[in-house]
Amino acid sequence: MSQEQPRRPREPVKYGDVFEVSGELADKPIAPEDAKMMQSAETHVFGHTQKGGPAAVMQSAATTNIRGGFVHPDDKTELVAERGATVEQTVPAATVTTEFVGGQVVGQHVEPRRVVAAARTDEEALQSTITIGEALEATVKTAGNKPVDQSDAAAIQAAEMRASGTNVIALAGVAASAQSAADHNATVDRDERKIKLRDVLTGAAGKLSADRAVTREDAEGVVSAEMRNNPKLCTHPGGVAASLTVAARLNERVDI
């Protein structure tokens, strides 16, 4: 009795299958050279590749694509070759690591730094916290090139309402701009013509009618809003919900 041969997958594993990315990159099969680029980037920053991180995910997908005959061992994605696969670390109060492929965020995590300091005054503690407006502005650095969609608009609306303490959305506020951008983008096919998060969130803190430090409850509310309005029921890596979550974690380490 002959052993049944394993079936080949009918389609390659694409970036959009494993990462929350959009546009041209989402439809591209993950190629072996792409995975090597991310492995190199992670090794340069961490000294090794991250278990379960973007590089590991990409390597697994690339191996599957080779076995399926969709790519060759030396294939690379032109878009990734042009824009690169990089790892960036930002935010002085913590190590916030953001990983990019082809200019889009594929992973982000935060490691708060241990700080041993003398007791601070209440005013000094308040000044060291991150506000909702500042967290929204931080999204420009991690996902500024992302076209605004309904999940972004919902997350921004939730953030603005929590900052103001009311359910009223200001006509000229950040949330109204985000909703307008999402509605516009829904009618546009090409990403380069869509309104991006950077267009909406640059200077967000100054556009809010009120602002305050981000709490865990704020972050959870924004995460819930973003997930509910995403067809995949997930948040965008480095997006609005992720930024609020990072800010809340950092604020919890400040003794106010």
From Swiss-Prot:
Embryo specific, only in dry mature seeds. Expressed at low levels. One of its GO terms (cellular component) is cytosol. Its main location: cytoplasm. InterPro entries: LEA_SMP, LEA_SMP_dom. It is found in: Cytoplasm; Nucleus. A motif (Nuclear localization signal (NLS)) lies at residues 5-9. Keywords: Cytoplasm, Nucleus, Repeat. Residues 13-66, 130-187, 195-253 form the SMP domain. Residues 1-14 have a biased composition (Basic and acidic residues). Residues 1-20 are annotated as: Disordered. The keyword Nuclease does not apply. It holds the Pfam family SMP. Belongs to the LEA type SMP family. PANTHER family: LATE EMBRYOGENESIS ABUNDANT PROTEIN 31-RELATED, SEED MATURATION FAMILY PROTEIN. LEA proteins are late embryonic proteins abundant in higher plant seed embryos. The function of those proteins is not known. This is Late embryogenesis abundant protein 32. It comes from Arabidopsis thaliana (Mouse-ear cress). The lineage of its organism: Eukaryota, Viridiplantae, Streptophyta, Embryophyta, Tracheophyta.
